[in-house]
Amino acid sequence: MEIKNLTTEQRNPATMHIDSMSTIDMVKTINKEDQKVAVAVGTQDDKIAQAIDEAAKRYSKGGRLIYIGAGTSGRLGVLDAAELVPTYGIKPERAIGLIAGGKGAMYVAVEGAEDSQDLAKRDLKDLKLNKNDIVLGLAASGRTPYVIGGLDYAKAIGALTISIACVKDSKIGHHADIAIEAVVGPEAITGSTRMKAGTAQKMILNMISTGVMIKQGKVFENVMIDVKPTNSKLIDRACRIIQTTTGVSTPEARNTLEKANNDVGLAIVMLKTNSDLNQAKNLLKAENGNVAEVLNK
């Protein structure tokens, strides 16, 4: 399909005169368009669930979440990868965002980078891609050559490939094991896919990465138990997590967190099972670090 025929490139009838609207009407119109995003993403629930299940299997075997994209799509992948480190306490090398043109492209567009399939292959080769890895290819238009090249190389290696696009029957979808296509319709500003398409991609990435982390045992009930308390805000959050899941006082939560060397999950197990540090460590080791499995026995 030619670029001009893509849904993401069509003019939106609802915003034809946005340039002459009052500020409040402008805001309301964009907001109304944004409300369509969650509905579009909802049509892909089954595919997103499939992506989570398959990705979780690979991740548990040591695989990595690797995001590839150009422009806004690439930046969203980098953002999702970066946030997983402090949120779930994973090592930075377990979630990696690749953007066409390299790190500099996060801030300034690198002309022509997205048009190279070979560039993506080289970027993935540099990471020593393997069959346990998960490659998520993002392209609002569903046709970015950089993403296609990366997905093809990943498939050849045997890695799991997931495509995320905002058009139906996307080109990248034909190069992936699982194709997620949230059709959000024309943008409020024609072709500005950082808007609805970007929001849809972010929502989908939120669900996939969160789902994978939940299945690794990094969430107990609905709290983050592998959060790394590296500043005062996160230390306070860690203590509140311990309090709300165990019912202890603030001082006891803080004291136990210190005894557990700032490991929230370990502190919870110590308190819930009335164990000392080593006993709690052994309980967690027996359940591969899964707090819920320890406490549900």
From Swiss-Prot:
One of its GO terms (molecular function) is ether hydrolase activity. Residues 55-218 form the SIS domain. GO terms for biological process: amino sugar catabolic process; N-acetylmuramic acid catabolic process; peptidoglycan turnover. It catalyses: N-acetyl-D-muramate 6-phosphate + H2O = N-acetyl-D-glucosamine 6-phosphate + (R)-lactate. Its EC number is 4.2.1.126. The active site is at E83, E114. Keywords: Carbohydrate metabolism, Lyase. Pathway: Amino-sugar metabolism; N-acetylmuramate degradation. A lyase-type mechanism (elimination/hydration) is suggested for the cleavage of the lactyl ether bond of MurNAc 6-phosphate, with the formation of an alpha,beta-unsaturated aldehyde intermediate with (E)-stereochemistry, followed by the syn addition of water to give product. Belongs to the GCKR-like family. MurNAc-6-P etherase subfamily. Specifically catalyzes the cleavage of the D-lactyl ether substituent of MurNAc 6-phosphate, producing GlcNAc 6-phosphate and D-lactate. Homodimer. This is N-acetylmuramic acid 6-phosphate etherase.
